[in-house]
Amino acid sequence: YVVTRVGQNGQSEYYNVEEYYRVRYTNTRMYLLNFERTMEEIFRGENDSISGNSILLGIRSKDVEYQTNESGKVVTFVQEGELWSYNQEANTLAKVFSFRGYEGVDDRENYGEHDIKIVNIDEAGSIDYIVYGYMNRGIHEGTVGIAVYHYDSLANTNEEQVFIPSSQSYEVMKSELGQLMYVTESGAFYIMVDGNVYGIDLNSLDTKVLVEGLSDEAVAISESNRFLAWVDPSAVRGSDTIHMIDFSTEKVTDVTGSASDYVKPLGFMQEDFV
């Protein structure tokens, strides 16, 4: 639920609150075994949000999804389902992406079954990022999937590069999305969704499917996400060949056993394949 209060500057402040109760019932009474409450402030980007070299995000968890450009002069961060960008030299704060409007908070806009992952940020402050989960509004409203966006900081414009629909729930997507996400210096972006590996050229916006139908039990990903090893989905428990792709070159190498051996990827030790 949402709570609101009037801040010191007279502006309305909004907070998303979640409560967790663990109870046990008997024939005679009810016991409260555990209670937890979390509160996250909906960042509004008001004038008092910046103090010296700090951005005051308000009440929230200490784990902030953020990235800076190489010089450290531009920082982009995620707060309660919104993406923001702050330019230290210009002392400007921009809301890059949000499903919410600027006046108040309603249930449709504030439905929190989505999240944002920052892919990269260049020296000019332009950002590539993905929005995944349930789409609250826009042309994909009511669907679940992954949208890849590019924000041009000079023009202050957002462009959707590709939308990948998904049959998974937001919670499943959230747990699986971190499995594979890799960006090359040339601007190629790789991501795995629903067992399919997609390659997206962030310059031309071309999208292709590299691998389809992967099973979790027959996939291994290196620590940097640069390498992916897998066996054919049709032979998960009886394959004599492991395929391994290097996303920096898209080169595929096959590792084979003897005629009577089956092979299976176990994992990586950093970048070394096991």
Where does each model-flagged region fall?
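Exposed beta-sheet edge and beta->alpha loop/turn motif
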Residues: 1-29
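Short beta-strand elements that form the blades of beta-propeller/WD-repeat-like
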Residues: 64-86, 117-148, 178-193, 225-236, ...
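Surface-exposed loop/turn elements that mediate protein-protein interactions on large endomembrane-trafficking
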Residues: 28-57, 83-109, 140-172, 192-212, ...
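Hydrophobic pocket-lining residues within nucleotide cofactor-binding pockets
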Residues: 3-4, 247, 262
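Repeated scaffold domains used in trafficking and secretory/extracellular systems
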Residues: 59-67, 104-121, 167-182, 212-224, ...
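Long, well-ordered mid-to-C-terminal structural blocks that present hydrophobic/aromatic surfaces
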Residues: 199, 205-230
